[in-house]
Amino acid sequence: MALPELKAWSRQIVNASGGQAHGALIEYDARPKIIGGKRCFQLSFVENSRDAAQRWESFLVAESGNEILVEDHAADQAMTLAQWRATRQPMQRTGVR
């Protein structure tokens, strides 16, 4: 996944940890999730260290096409990338705005 947020998060994790942790994209459920009639892969971006993997965000990536949604676990729904960027401002986690 080539989202600029994930690239920036990965760089920040490596820099902040002195190379001891890395960003990783992992599948958290092998079963596709159906959203709006579309089958989606269920992936999470995690901070992966020697001791643990800490989830930063979960994504739903359409099996066909290029749609990417972000899971809002609190509201139990998915939001578009535009909604996610507007409401969660993910680049603020890196100091980039």
How does the language model describe each region?
Residues 69-97:
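C-terminal partner/receptor-binding element of secreted or periplasmic proteins
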Residues 19-63:
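Exposed beta-strand-loop-beta-strand "reactive/processing" segments of non-cytosolic proteins
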Residues 1-30:
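Short, non-transmembrane alpha-helical segments in secretory-pathway proteins
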